[in-house]
């Protein structure tokens, strides 16, 4: 799977629904071990290192694939800024989404959840989750049941640990990556140390971070985002305020946010993302539009709890 497709899969799946969107067109067979740690060069300064061997040969293959990059394409200035003091995150929040591709009916469903605020590695952290599943009839040809877990700093939503538990077409991959800006910080057993830039967020943390931004005062934010494979630079820009949006969950006035994704300082031209956040204190992610060369996708909010 190409790096661009990998990012789109994780972004669409974990931000607002349906890892299937890019895989419909581009899915290839992925070795179980490779999927957990692949970082293609040239890349931003991310490296993954296996600190301890797993009980099977897969972990040794993971370690063999670990690489260290040398370029620094992202501007990390203020990327770890403290989230809005009036953060809208609440423990137990859950959102249900449906992913629609072009003229097809729902091909996947997604559930996002703010599971809890807890102590993690001695710090206050949010435990964020996403669950993606394909639906019939597409499920008959591509069965997908994925879960993503993020432990993100409660103040900044900077990633501390990112987990991918993938089950796609009967093939399973489990990856637990500890975010580590420090060069020699050890990772515990069954965990990979991912060397990332300070202030790096994972896709789940980035989604929630966008909710904390006061878009009436801040027209643009930037952040490095690590998707479990590679580091990207994400620029989020306010494109409109009071945009009317209707989805199954209801009608909303929204902030229209353009998401620009840069791979090694070069903008990804083959995908264009627009995120709509409700113009309320909750700033609910109500709709994502993804325009791709082969299809247009809408990920719509079905229900918020």
Give the label of every model feature segment:
Residues 7, 15-179, 215-305:
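Acidic, serine/threonine-rich low-complexity disordered tracts
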Residues 1-12:
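Membrane interfacial helix-start segments of signal peptides and signal-anchor transmembrane helices
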Residues 179-226:
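Active-site/ligand-binding surface loops and adjacent short beta/alpha elements
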């Amino acid at each position: 799977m190409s790096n661009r497709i990998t990012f789109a899969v994780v972004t669409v799946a974990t931000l607002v629904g349906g890892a299937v969107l890019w895989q419909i067109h581009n899915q290839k067979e992925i070795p179980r071990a490779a999927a957990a740690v692949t970082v293609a060069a040239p890349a931003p300064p991310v490296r993954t290192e296996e600190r301890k061997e797993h009980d099977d040969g897969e972990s040794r293959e993971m370690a063999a694939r670990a690489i260290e990059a040398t370029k620094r394409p992202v501007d990390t200035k203020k990327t770890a800024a403290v989230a809005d003091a009036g953060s809208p995150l609440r423990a137990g929040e859950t959102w249900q989404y449906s992913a629609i591709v072009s003229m097809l009916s729902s091909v996947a469903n997604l559930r996002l959840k703010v599971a809890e605020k807890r102590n993690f590695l001695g710090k206050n952290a949010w435990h964020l989750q996403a669950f993606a599943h394909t639906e019939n009839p597409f499920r008959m040809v591509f069965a997908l049941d994925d879960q993503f877990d993020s432990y993100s700093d409660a103040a900044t939503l900077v990633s501390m640990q990112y987990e991918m538990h993938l089950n796609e077409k009967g093939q399973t991959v489990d990856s637990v990556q500890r975010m580590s800006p420090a060069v020699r910080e050890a990772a515990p057993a069954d965990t990979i140390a991912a060397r990332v830039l300070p202030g790096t967020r994972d896709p789940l943390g980035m989604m929630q971070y966008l909710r904390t931004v006061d878009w009436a005062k801040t027209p643009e934010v930037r952040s490095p985002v690590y998707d479990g494979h590679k580091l990207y630079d994400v620029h989020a820009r306010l494109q409109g305020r009071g945009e009317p949006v209707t989805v199954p969950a209801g009608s909303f006035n929204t902030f229209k946010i353009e998401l620009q994704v840069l791979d090694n300082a070069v903008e990804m031209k083959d995908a264009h993302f627009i995120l709509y956040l409700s113009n309320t204190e909750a700033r609910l992610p109500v709709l994502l539009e993804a325009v791709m060369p082969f299809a247009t996708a809408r990920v719509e909010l079905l229900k918020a709890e």
